[in-house]
Amino acid sequence: MSTFDDRDNAFEAKFAHDQEKEFRAEMMALRQIAVWGVSLMQISPDEKEHRTAALQSLEMQKGAKALILAQLADDLSGDVDEDAIKTTYDLFLQDAREKLG
């Protein structure tokens, strides 16, 4: 194996590692935004638990971020605007990235 092949393999491994870290950070942020959004709702604790689980079940679907943020915007309409939800998600994502290194 040549030096070029070694470098190529190292770049591929780093890219895969970075992608996995970003995926994990996004999942952490989605879980946090679901909990945050539901905590703002004026519903019973049991209903909050159910809503949080329902939102978190969307995590693995294609377009999960858009689905979860849209659902929260709909559920919180009148209380929290869509920009505030997106800003809060971005803060959770930044925090998750920092935690993962």
What label would you give each PLM region?
Residues 1-101:
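A charge-rich, low-complexity, intrinsically flexible signal that marks solvent-exposed coils, linkers
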